[in-house]
Structure formats: C-alpha cells, structure tokens
Amino acid sequence: MKLMDVRVSGLNVWITDKHILKGISFKAQPGTVTAIMGPSGSGKSTLIRVINRLIDLIPGARVEGEVWINNMNVMKEDPYNIRRYTGMVFQEPNPFPHMTIYENVAIGPKLHGLAKNKKELDEIVEWALKMAHLWDEVKDRLSDYPHQLSGGQRQRLSLARALALKPRVLLLDEPTANIDPVSTVKIEQSIVEYAKEEMATVIIVTHTPQQAARISDQILFLYEGRVIEYGPTKELVLRPRHELTKKFLGGEV
C-alpha cells in the first residue's frame, strides 16, 4: 500500500483578473480527513480542483505556488499520472446514466487492469459498494440503472465508482449538499472508514461546520480566498483563535 500525502505551499490562483486563492499553504496526511471549510465564494472548490488539475479546464485560470502529491509536482506532472492516484466526488451525483449499477463501479477497475478475471472484478465491485454503504440496498439489482435509484443512492454510487480504484488521495466537493440525511450519514461513515482502513489522504470541501467537526481530523478555514485558521479539528472548533472563525462557527458569516 503506497501512502501519499498532499502538500500545498504559497498557492495563488487567478481566474482571468480575479484573485481567487491567496497564499494558501497546508498539508494533508495519509489516514486522515482534512475538511476545507468556509462560506460560499471562499475558494474551496477551486482549491481541490488545483490538486487534481481540473483547474486546467477553467478558461483564464492561472496558478502560482506549489502543490505536491508525495514526490509529484502536480502543476508539472502529466494530469493522467495525477488522476491515477486521485479520486473525485462532486456535489451533484454523476453516475454514467447508460451503464448499470454494476458497470458504473466496474468500469474503472476494468480499464486499469485491476482485475484478472470476472471473480476478482465482482469482488472489487462488492467491496466498493460496501465501502459506500450501498451494497445491502442494491446487491439484488446490480443490473438496474442509476435513474432507478434515489438521489442519495446515486451519490453513493458515484462514491463507490471513485473508491473502486482505491485512490490514495480522495477529493470530495460538498458531496452531501443535495442529498437526504440518511445518505449523508452513510457517506460520512464511508469517508472516515476509507481514510482509516486504507490509509488514504481524504480532503473534503464543506460549508457546514457541523460536518467538518463530525468527520475531520483537521480543518482549513478559508474566507475570501485566504487561510484564516488551520489546525486540529477539536482545537479549532472548541478554541478558535480568530474572530472570523468564531463567527463562522456561530453562523454569523
């Protein structure tokens, strides 16, 4: 099992002439969950899109500073190599609509040659669906299509698809923002279990302090593109040092 950390140093991002991220630095370790927390428009989603080079797809984006995944310089590495080790789950569920539940989870391992035969592929699919807390709900309907699932189930299917490749770095952009409370709890459980059991580096964007407090080991609090506070979750939540952090935790900003 290869352990991979994420290190960000002096990161600045502009989109056309707008300065989105301003001097961001932090480190995320294997076996931990890092929550990037802050109000809408603080640059949270932009930050994780730099880590897996999705920033390249945004017209007018310019990046300065350093981002490392282990010994890979993210901004100089081939994006394909970066994405071999990183998984991504977005805010909106995005399973492949014309593939079955089984095919959605199996497609990644098949393309990357992770299974020698059908039995091994079946085992990967079952493991990923169990890790996403979806297996018990779909094990007898693997040939169904995503439109036959609820929104929360579709999001857990998106998570299972990402987990099937066992990414060493898992990035999640507000994955529970638009789903039901039951699926939210299950996805939060999956995130923590995956980080701990697979010693993966997990980074989740959230605008909800309560979610950050429940699942993360450390919090990076962003406000208007700057790091306001960064540290262990319990310490930051119980003893915030900055007035803006106190206000955000109290629902005032």
UniProtKB/Swiss-Prot annotation:
Keywords: ATP-binding, Cell membrane, Membrane, Nucleotide-binding, Phosphate transport, Translocase, Transport. Its EC number is 7.3.2.1. GO terms for cellular component: plasma membrane. One of its GO terms (molecular function) is ATP hydrolysis activity. It holds the Pfam family ABC_tran. GO terms for biological process: phosphate ion transmembrane transport. SUPFAM superfamilies: P-loop containing nucleoside triphosphate hydrolases. InterPro entries: AAA+_ATPase (IPR003593), ABC_transporter-like_ATP-bd (IPR003439), ABC_transporter-like_CS (IPR017871), P-loop_NTPase (IPR027417), PstB-like (IPR005670). It is found in: Cell membrane. ATP binds at G38, P39, S40, G41, S42, G43, K44, S45. It comes from the Archaea. Residues 1-249 form the ABC transporter domain. Its main location: membrane. It is a peripheral membrane protein. It catalyses: phosphate(out) + ATP + H2O = ADP + 2 phosphate(in) + H(+). It is an enzyme of class 7 (translocase). PANTHER family: ABC TRANSPORTER I FAMILY MEMBER 17 (PTHR43423:SF1). Part of the ABC transporter complex PstSACB involved in phosphate import. Responsible for energy coupling to the transport system. Belongs to the ABC transporter superfamily. Phosphate importer (TC 3.A.1.7) family. The complex is composed of two ATP-binding proteins (PstB), two transmembrane proteins (PstC and PstA) and a solute-binding protein (PstS). This is Phosphate import ATP-binding protein PstB.
